[in-house]
Amino acid sequence: MSLETALARVTTLQTWLQPQPVQQALPATATQFSAALQGASAPMGLAPTAGATATSGTPAGQAILNAIRPEVGQAEQPPGSNDSPRIAQYRQATAGSGVGPWCAYFVSWAARQAGVPIGDTGQGFGRVDDVFAWAQKAGKALPAGSTPSPGDLIVWDEHIGVVERVDPDGTIHTIEGNSSDRVSQRTYGSDGGGAVGYVRLG
């Protein structure tokens, strides 16, 4: 659809909605029109324009990403131990968890840092299954096949991470704890590498 056609349709709709004469300046360029249209559609939850990379999600999701981006590269000491002084801090965000696989500790820590703690009492979880079961009960789970937003948790069978961004072609970029014994950035196809679902915390 051309810019002129789109503007004509917008003008017609405005006339129907507001029968009194209204003087409005139309955007001078296609870029201004696109920005105005995006701004108007954002509150309705409409998807970004085609070709756009989803780089920001909810405020809670953005806060989670702000917490975890500096953690990329944090590694187990020694490798294969599921532990380090920093991983011990992630573990403290869960109730009574011991040394063990720590991807769920990491997302529990990140959510707590972002002010949206996981669990009915904010206790966090040491097991992926517990995170997803809580999210389903709390109405925060999204099914496999959904399009995630940055900051959403991405859940697999026995592993969990955080969506960093989603490319226009559906490619999903993540940050994950306990991935190759460290906090790592990974990339998956639009199916999230077989993700079983997502969790949107805010």
Task: Report each predicted region and the residues it spans.
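N-terminal capping segments
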Residues: 33-118
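Hydrophobic/basic alpha-helical segments enriched in Actinobacteria
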Residues: 13, 67-72, 79-80, 85, ...
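Generic helix-packing signal
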Residues: 10, 71-72, 112-115, 165, ...
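Glycine-rich catalytic cores of cysteine/serine-nucleophile enzymes that process amide/ester linkages
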Residues: 82, 86-98, 155-193
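...with weaker cross-activation on analogous glycine-rich loops/strands in unrelated enzymes
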Residues: 116-181
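Short, compositionally biased, intrinsically disordered N-terminal export/targeting signals
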Residues: 1-35, 57-61, 202
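Low-complexity, Gly/Ser/Thr/Pro-rich intrinsically disordered linker/tail segments
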Residues: 9, 191-202
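Charged/polar, solvent-exposed surface patches and flexible loops
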Residues: 5-8, 12-15, 35, 39, ...
